[in-house]
A protein has these predicted regions:
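Basic/polar, cationic surfaces and motifs that engage anionic cell-wall
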Residues: 2-3, 8, 27-109, 223, ...
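Serine/proline-rich low-complexity intrinsically disordered segments, especially terminal tails, linkers
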Residues: 6-7, 15, 190
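Active-site-adjacent loop/helix surface patches within enzyme catalytic domains
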Residues: 105-269
Length: 322
C-alpha cells in the first residue's frame, strides 16, 4: 500500500528534521491547497436526491437513498434514472448494523494483502463526524465513489499499460505534503492504495458539501474514494472533452479494493454506509461531475460478496474459535 507506513514516517520525519526531496516527481511534495481566493458558492436546490439539512441525510430509507445516489450521467450528461433496486449484496446491508465483520478479523486479514499500514493502524478509530467532527453530530453516512477523470489523452489512444504499471498508476501523482489531497483514499488500476486522509478526518470534495448554505455542517458526513480512470475525448463533444473511459472502465482489482474499503469504513462507522456517486451528489450544480464514469454496480456488489466470504460473519468467526 503506497502512502502507508513508509510515506507517513518519511513525512513525519521531514516535519521534525527539515525538508526532504523525493525526486524525480515534483508531485510528491506538491502543494495542493488552492492558491487563490474562492468566492462563496451557493446552490439552488437540495440536489437530485433531496438532502435535508436538518437530519443531514437524503430522502428515504438508506436503501432508497442508495438507489438515488448510485447514478451516473448518460451520454447527454443528464443524470440517469433512479435504480429500480440494489444488488442483493447491497440491499441486505446498506444502512443496517448487522452482518459487519469484527475489527479483529479485519486486522488479521489486512496483512495477508499487504495493507496493514494505516488501514490497520486506524482500524480501531471511528470515522469522522459531521460539523467538522463535532462529537454531538452524526458519524459519516455516505461512502462516495469518484474517479480521477484523468489524465485526459484527448484524441490519442490509451497506452497499453494503463492497467499495469506506468505513469497513469503512479500514486505519487496524488500525494500532497501540505495535507490538502482531494480524497481520503486513491485506488490505482492495479489495486494499490494511497491513504491521503484517514476516514477519521473530516473532509469535503464535492461542490454540494462546500455550498455556503451548509457552512461546515457537511464536513465529515461523506467519505471520499478516488479510483484512477484515464479519459479520452469523444467525437462531437468539443476538443477537450473527457467523455470516454477505457475498456474496462475500472479493473477487477479496483472493484475488489473499493469493496474492501467500503467494508472497513462501515465497520468503523458501526453501520453499513450508503454508497454514493459524485455525479449524483453534484447533479444539479453547474459544471458538475460525471464520475465514476461507467461504474458497474454489479461488479462492486460481487466484489463485496467476495470480500465478505473471505472475512466470514461474526457468528462464523466466533464458531471457529470455539
Amino acid at each position: 500500500m503506497r502512502g502507508s507506513s513508509k510515506i507517513y514516517e518519511w513525512l513525519r520525519a521531514a516535519m521534525l528534521a527539515g525538508p526532504i526531496v523525493l525526486a524525480p516527481l515534483d508531485a510528491v511534495l506538491a502543494d495542493c491547497k488552492p492558491d487563490h481566493f474562492r468566492p462563496l458558492f451557493f446552490i439552488k436546490s437540495m440536489g437530485a436526491c433531496a438532502f435535508d439539512s436538518e437530519t443531514l441525510s437524503f430522502a428515504g430509507t438508506p436503501a432508497e437513498q442508495a438507489t438515488c445516489l448510485m447514478r451516473g450521467m448518460d451520454s447527454s450528461r443528464n443524470l440517469e434514472p433512479r435504480l429500480q433496486g440494489l444488488p442483493h449484496a447491497l440491499a441486505e446491508r446498506v444502512g443496517k448494523t448487522n452482518g459487519l465483520p469484527l475489527r479483529a478479523t479485519l486486522s488479521d486479514y489486512l496483512p495477508m494483502l499487504g495493507l496493514e499500514g494505516e488501514l490497520g493502524d486506524f482500524l480501531w478509530l471511528p470515522v469522522s463526524r459531521a460539523h467538522d467532527n463535532d462529537l454531538a453530530a452524526p458519524m459519516a453516512r455516505y461512502f462516495v465513489i469518484h474517479d480521477t477523470s484523468g489524465p485526459n489523452f484527448g484524441r490519442r489512444s490509451f497506452p497499453d499499460d494503463i492497467d499495469g504499471g506506468g505513469k497513469v498508476n503512479d500514486l505519487r501523482n496524488f500525494e500532497c505534503h501540505d495535507g490538502w489531497g482531494k480524497a481520503h483514499v486513491v485506488i490505482s488500476r492495479t489495486g494499490e492504495l494511497l491513504l491521503v486522509h484517514d476516514y477519521s478526518t473530516p473532509w469535503r470534495e464535492t461542490k454540494f458539501e462546500q455550498a455556503a448554505e451548509f457552512g461546515g455542517a457537511l464536513k465529515g458526513l461523506f467519505l471520499h474514494n478516488e479510483m484512477i480512470q484515464p479519459r479520452r475525448s469523444a467525437p462531437g463533444r468539443g476538443r477537450r472533452n473527457d467523455a470516454r473511459s477505457p475498456d474496462p472502465p475500472f479493473t477487477a482489482a479496483q472493484y475488489d479494493r473499493i469493496a474492501l474499503l467500503y467494508v472497513i469504513a462501515s465497520v468503523r462507522a458501526e453501520h453499513w454506509l450508503i454508497p454514493a456517486f459524485h455525479a449524483a451528489i453534484d447533479a444539479q450544480i453547474p459544471n458538475g461531475h460525471d464520475d465514476p464514469l461507467n461504474f458497474n454496480i454489479d461488479n462492486f456488489a460481487n466484489s463485496l460478496d467476495a470480500v465478505m466470504a473471505k472475512l466470514g460473519t461474526p457468528d462464523q468467526v466466533q464458531a471457529a474459535h470455539q
